[in-house]
Amino acid sequence: MATDTLVDDIYRMIDTKEIPDGVPIEQVINDFGENVKQILRNNITESKFDKRKLRMSNIGKKDRQLWYSYNGYKGEELMPHTRIKFLYGHLIEEMVLALTKLAGHDVTHEQKQVEVQGIKGSMDCKIDGVLTDVKSASPYGFKKFKDGSLINDDPFGYVDQIKGYAHAEGTTDVGWLVMDKTN
């Protein structure tokens, strides 16, 4: 299958309940359940990680922000509703990947650990061989992915993040799979 039909394939599968032959339905469902349990477990028991380390997920952040983190300055504590928003994003990512599999697309390299010159990260996956970063976004953020303006207005560093994963994998075949979290 090709990634250019991915969204339509998911919608078709949801609408018709027809899952392509060969898709291990029960395995996908069981894996989804286990992954959701782990996400919740991590979010309610996870201890703080060392923010002084540069990671793929923060290489696109502003230099000043990275400097403060690296030098141990504490920023504002995240509010509980913000933590829940991040949890929601992780759950959406897992759901989207399960739907991708159920629609018959090949999802590999999930959470593969990569490294470029000592900077480590966990790429989301490859879908049909394409390095893919899965995101949930507000309608405003979603529009940036859809119209391509993210390349010039990227407050979260997503472009640099995916470039880092691409460099580690030796590929230029990359993309985002983004869900508008309000629709």
What are these regions (language model features)?
Residues 102-105, 137, 167-174:
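Alpha-helix capping at helix-to-loop junctions
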Residues 136-138, 180-181:
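A short beta-strand motif that forms part of the nucleic acid-binding face
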Residues 27, 152-156, 164-183:
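Metal-dependent nuclease catalytic regions and adjoining charged, substrate-binding loops involved
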Residues 1-131, 138-156:
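Metal-dependent nuclease catalytic cores that hydrolyze phosphodiester bonds in DNA/RNA
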Residues 126, 131-134, 173-178:
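A structural signal for short, well-ordered beta-strand segments and their strand-loop junctions
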